[in-house]
Amino acid sequence: MRQRKNVTKFIKRAYRDMGELKQYKRYTKTRLNIISNKVFLLKNELYPLQPKKKRGKRDQQLKTTYTKKKLKRILSLLFRIGGKIYRKKIKKKKINLKKQQEPFTQNLTLHRLFRKFYLNLKLKQFKLLYKKYKGNEKVIIQQLEKRVDMVLLRSGFVRSLYEARQIINHKHLLVNGKIASLPGYMINVGDIISFKEGSMKRKLLKRLKKGLISKKSRKRWTNRNFKFKRFQNYKRKRQKKKNKNKVRATGPNYLEISHSLLLISLIEEPKLTAIKYPFTLQPEKNIKFITLLKKYKRLR
């Protein structure tokens, strides 16, 4: 009886679909929960609880039906997903543990990442491309890669899309000798991109000379034979730190780049194998996320 009176406070629990972890006010024995480092109760350790008075439709009686098998299922599913529950963020909500395995959720996350990669591409622009090319996903990705700001980023002259759009908005960029003031300007095969003569061009040339890693410097480094291994490892680590912020003189196969003259030309239409993204997207396989625009009109 003393234990019942002293232990009055209880900890809030997550309300799961499988297992129905609910709140209990009075208990004696406690064991740590593997999920949240908290307390959970087994069937044998519970006291018969008094039912609450019904004040309305929302208030319901507490149930003591609680099995060990359901706990094991919950724990195994949580460890697969890697879900973590924190003390402050626990709320009474039904959560589908199989939600991440569904194809719709995977496609929706890819859809949002894809739009953020192109600097929050508006749905209006995205839907216009979808209607124009009749839902052909390969052609949509090719057209997005033909934009001027994306070509600058893929070439290596620019570190981010923000910098590329700043150059275009300030009218430092030329396409076939004419100013391109829009970042969504589409480039055709055979077009030549260049920079205006001025301060912006000089800054880019200085940065590229310092930043580019030439092939000759790599060969010299490999051919050297140092006497001591410790000194050799120290030099390699030091060189790796310097080369982190540098830009490599490489680009995709569908672009021809000259770093000395700051010229870019599109030779072929971009292929899906040559396109790379920072997140895990295989454009050859996971292109079906664009078809969400058909079924669900209110995508954010």
Swiss-Prot record:
Gene Ontology biological process terms, A to Z: aggregation involved in sorocarp development; regulation of apoptotic process; regulation of cell cycle; ribosomal small subunit biogenesis
Please list the disulfide bridges: none
Q: Which domain of life is it from?
A: Eukaryota
Per UniProt, subcellular location reads as: Mitochondrion
Task: Indicate the segments forming the S4 RNA-binding domain, all copies.
Answer: 146-209
Give the similarity note.
Answer: Belongs to the universal ribosomal protein uS4 family.
Q: What is this protein called?
A: Small ribosomal subunit protein uS4m
Q: Which organism is it from?
A: Dictyostelium discoideum (Social amoeba)
